[in-house]
Structures are given as structure tokens and as C-alpha cells.
Regions:
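Alpha-helical subdomain
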Residues: 2-4, 19-103, 199-200, 204-367
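Short hydrophobic transmembrane-like helices used for membrane targeting/insertion
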Residues: 4-16
């Protein structure tokens, strides 16, 4: 975004931000107000950056560039968009590092931009789309009120909570995007968790709220003796069945539409990945109690979540916590807060290990 804001030019921004007691042309240090203002301006530009990535994804521009560089006019013809504004969008995307502007309106994908293709492992296209879709975007408009009131204002933004919104037939496409985004984002985390988790003595696994089943299916691929199941809302389970069939695992897999607050199938192992952060403590206890009531003797649960670390240390979990406040009743938690939830639900944390991307696996045993 430096082409637009000029924020890399410290003396240039001094005309905008002002420099108390400093004449034009005077050298300034990074701690002086102009540089600080530039850093803040770039943070505020995150709103624009998210929309640029969302538009790239929706217009399939990275897919159109998959085979090599094209002009903005060629991309516009394929995308069905206006040539001049497509050029402006692609120019902005190049400032964000998503595209490489080669001159003469010609662009190619960068390594970052490749992640917005629809056909690559770990694709973030669905995430770019869902983050800029109404269910997320409208909720952020009420964020300050959420801070004032102490709880999400999603009902004010959407007329209902986020998961009710996704369950409505008219929002099925957005709900499917959300499920796909969660599955795509879990790739590295899933690999780390599968590598760290022992399935000795485990025959049956239930992926609680598992969307398209990426986690349990990866575990089944690693252990051919396992039978797996996904429990999720109706809009997600069809995708789980399709994914199991694609991987050749349908004979050991089933998907059940249900409500994890009410009842879960019996199993030796429950996978509860990035579920608890969507809910308040009482709701988390209810989910885990459902698992505790149904677990087979000697069974376990694996919870995978971000864990808030030491205060004052840069921590993605604390930023993600703001998204939880904006859109859900949930929160990111530290280990002490997790342990309180586990204990109240009849579990004890027996192991904790990093699984990638700032996420941790927390193995639970029934007590």
C-alpha cells in the first residue's frame, strides 16, 4: 500500500501527521511521530487489504493467472469485470505482495498470491471470501459496542447468532465457504496433531464439529485400523461424506448431522479442534460433558486450540480473541482457563504439545 500512502517516506508523511518542534527536512528516528503515524496508518489499511484479497478471490484472478502472466484487460475479459478497475485492483494487489506488476498492465502471481488459487493445497481462497462476507464483515461493524457491553453484538448485526445465520437455507453458500475455509486452514495444524497423537488402543474416533472431516480423515489415513465419524450441522456433513469418498475412506467413515450440545456418538477418542473458542465457558463445559458422557471406558479427547501465552509477548491468540468477541460468545483462553473448563466437564489435561501455527494439542482423560 506504499504507492497510495507514501508511508515508507518518513519526511513525506510529516506534512500529513505534523512534527512537533521539527523543521522539514530534519532527520527523524523511527520513534518520532511521523514514523509512528505511518505504522498506525498501515495497520488501519488492513480493512482495505482484506477487501482487496476478497475481490481477488471472488473474481478468481489468481486462478486466471495460474498458467502465467496476463494483462489486466485479459483478466477482466475472463473474470467478467471492468478493465480499468480490474487494473486498479491488481495494481493494489501488487502493492500488497499478492501479484507482481511487470509493466504494461501485465501481472503474474507471487508465492503469496498463489495461496488464493482454488486448486492448491492449503488454499486460503475460501478464507478470503468468508472473511469479507456479510456474516463476518457486518459483525465487525458493531465491535466497539461488543467491548462496551461485554458480549458479541452479532444478533444486532445479523438478527441472530453466527451459527444460526449459517444454518439458514438462504445463507447455505456462505456456510459452505466457512466450512471449507476452516478445513483448508487446518492443514498444517492437522499434520502436526496427527504426528503427535498416539492412536494406540483406539478403534473409533468422532470429530466433533469436524466440518468436512479433514482432521479425522487424516488420522484414518495414518492408521488404517481406525473407524471415523464427523458430527456437525447438516450443511457440513455432505461435504464430509464427499471428502471421505474422494480419499477412498467411505467404508470406514460416517457423517452424522447433529448437535454437540445435546448428544455425541460413543467413541474411544474425540477430536475437538478449534471448537471451544467459539463458545463461552458454560457452553464449552456442555460440549465436553456430552463427550464425557459418551466416551468408551479408557477413552480420551484431544482439544486443539490457540493458547494465550505470557502477557506482553506478541501473541496471535490475543488478536484472534478479538474476532471471537466480534462474532461469537467465545474467547481464546490460557491454560488455566482451559483447565477450569476441563475440570468442570469431568476431564483432566494429561498432555500438552504444539501442533503448528501457534496451536496446541491438549489431551484429556476422563476423571
Amino acid at each position: 500500500m506504499t504507492d497510495v500512502t507514501g508511508m515508507n517516506d518518513v519526511t513525506g508523511i510529516s506534512d500529513v501527521a505534523g512534527t512537533t518542534g521539527t523543521a522539514k527536512g530534519t532527520n527523524v528516528t523511527p520513534s518520532d511521530p511521523p514514523a509512528d503515524a505511518g505504522a498506525v496508518f498501515n495497520l488501519l489499511g488492513g480493512l482495505v487489504a482484506a477487501q482487496v484479497l476478497g475481490a481477488l478471490a471472488e473474481l478468481h484472478i489468481p486462478d486466471h493467472l495460474a498458467d502465467g502472466a496476463l494483462t489486466a484487460e485479459e483478466v477482466a475479459e475472463r473474470a467478467g469485470s471492468h478493465p480499468q478497475t480490474t487494473y486498479r485492483l491488481m495494481r493494489a494487489a501488487s502493492s500488497l505482495g499478492m501479484l507482481d506488476h511487470q509493466g504494461q498492465h501485465r501481472f503474474r502471481l507471487t508465492g503469496l498470491g498463489r495461496l488464493l488459487r482454488s486448486d492448491v493445497p492449503g488454499s486460503m481462497r475460501s478464507m478470503a471470501l468468508v472473511q469479507t462476507s456479510p456474516g463476518h464483515w457486518q459483525s465487525w461493524a458493531h465491535f466497539t459496542e461488543a467491548v462496551r457491553q461485554g458480549s458479541t453484538q452479532t444478533k444486532k448485526a445479523l438478527g441472530m447468532d453466527l451459527f444460526e445465520y449459517f444454518a439458514r437455507p438462504e445463507n447455505s453458500a456462505e456456510a459452505a465457504l466457512f466450512s471449507q475455509a476452516m478445513g483448508n486452514m487446518s492443514g498444517l495444524v492437522t499434520q502436526g496433531a496427527v504426528a503427535a497423537l498416539s492412536t494406540a488402543g483406539v478403534s473409533t474416533v468422532v470429530d466433533v464439529g469436524g466440518a468436512h472431516g479433514d482432521f479425522v480423515l487424516a488420522l484414518m489415513e495414518a492408521d488404517p485400523e481406525l473407524s471415523g465419524q464427523v458430527l456437525d450441522l447438516p450443511h457440513a456433513v455432505d461435504g464430509a461424506r464427499a471428502e471421505a469418498e474422494k480419499r477412498g475412506l467411505s467404508d470406514r467413515f460416517s457423517a452424522v448431522a447433529g448437535d454437540f450440545f445435546q448428544e455425541v456418538p460413543s467413541a474411544d477418542l474425540y477430536l475437538v479442534k478449534t471448537i471451544l473458542h467459539d463458545w463461552d465457558d458454560a457452553q464449552c463445559v456442555t460440549i465436553l460433558r456430552s463427550c464425557r458422557s459418551a466416551v468408551n471406558e479408557g477413552g480420551r479427547a484431544l482439544v486443539v486450540e490457540l493458547v494465550v501465552g505470557e502477557l506482553g509477548r506478541p501473541d496471535f491468540a490475543t488478536v484472534s480473541d478479538m474476532a471471537m468477541l466480534a462474532m461469537t460468545n467465545g474467547r481464546e483462553r490460557d491454560l488455566t482457563e482451559f483447565d477450569a473448563v476441563f475440570t468442570a466437564a469431568g476431564w483432566r489435561r494429561s498432555k500438552t504439545y504444539p501442533v503448528g501455527g501457534g496451536y496446541f494439542g491438549m489431551e484429556l482423560v476422563a476423571v
